[in-house]
Amino acid sequence: MFIAMNRFKIVKGKEKDFETVWRNRETHLDGVDGFHNFCLVKGEQAEDHTLYASHSTWETRQHFSDWTKSDAFKIAHKNAGNHSHLYIGHPHFEGFEVVDGI
């Protein structure tokens, strides 16, 4: 199993706007080979931002990689730049291979 995460620093006071964008978006993940699930999680607040992370699980790293090169990925991310005023910097990607679990 592979876990893909993007960390987002969201401008303080824009959290609800950010969450609304995520709730209303078209993911285009239904039926994508190897996709298991997705969560958006909210973390700690800092002086100027609130930390969020997107968390998706995939059958393998290759399944995730294939999705990032797909038309479904391009369509799902085509409007990502429209909300840049909500972010401090760019998202930070982290990928993890699951080595143990319950």
Which residue ranges define each predicted feature?
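Residue-level signal for secondary-structure boundary sites
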Residues: 16, 62-64, 101
